Amino acid sequence: MIMFRDEFNSVCNAAKGKMALLNNNPAGYFMSAMVAGAFITLGGFVTFTLGSILTAAGCTITKVIMAFSFASALSLVVMAGAELFTGNNFVMAAASFKKEVSWLDTLKLWVVCYLGNFVGAVILVALFQLGGVPKGATGEYFATIAAGKMGGTASTLFFKGMLCNMLVCLAVWCCTKMKTESGKLIMIFWCIYIFM
């Protein structure tokens, strides 16, 4: 008997469901991807705002608190059933390797999902800007974090992104295995804690 056969089949069935949604309701799929991008942006905004406040207060465990805070972003995505590119890398690749979904369909879904995530993130950033946030010390903190994240070489950024994506995929896999919503949330928090 193969370990985790049922869970792996659930992942493949989820991939087929994602493809069906994309094929039957492309606008609905794109909207779901936009929502995921907005949730990740919202989680990032809350995390970095919190980081700004804690850093200014001289907190010595700012990074630990920020890690737990950012886990809220993926929690929102998973619990709402939104379409996130990084999680879909695992789901769609698994189904493609099992030949449940074609690689061409997987690539199509990845492109649409990535674009939807990007558009959702940009819209939320625009809303933050129009709302006057972030500004002052918080805005400066955001700029410092962004500069630090983009300060590496292209290969360094690529491999860091790959490692982060592995942890998101692990969180998605753990959510497949967990039988309760609380179990899913706990595993998301642990995977994203490592990520940060």
Residue ranges and their predicted role:
Residues 2-196:
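Alpha-helical transmembrane segments and their helix-helix packing motifs
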